[in-house]
């Protein structure tokens, strides 16, 4: 875990019995090969893969359903249950959003991780998935690179690449990415403050490093509708470019 994330999590948990810890006993793990991903009952995912593969992947994340009026974050909803789906390593987390339910399925396959989100019920017409992700290639806090590949995702859609030296991490969605936004990480004075900062946040991006040299990214994906259900799958993939090329990694991501 990066220093920024660890300090912010400590501030959030201050006042609890063990604020310095990041407990995982409440959630579940999905792993395959040399990638291991923790799935929290609040929906966020985090990589615990560095000791297995030397690749750090996702340091923090947050998922939500965005409409024209608001964003419904999964960690603000009441989780109905979390369990391993039919005795597999698929983790299903279910939430009650009032007029509809949210079903999140997480599965790790090799160095790819799939987060499948399905809504059931009276779904808002303009609803789409929003995901905040912080990648930490090489365990880096800052000075990572970020590229947007306009036609590298499924059906010629976008894919995002975050990298530092040999580790290159990718994200796309089965229904394509319609929006990719940068995020300003915690500034030095914010790291020193006592205040907990919630991400993602609305802020004016003024400097080049805010949009290109940070592992923080917000992506949006449309939902594919079938009857009273709507769904999409977010795909993240870790790669070592001493083992595979960018072209090979993007080809794996598409398929």
Q: What is the predicted role of each segment?
A:
Residues 1-255:
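Terminal accessory carbohydrate-recognition/targeting modules of carbohydrate-active enzymes
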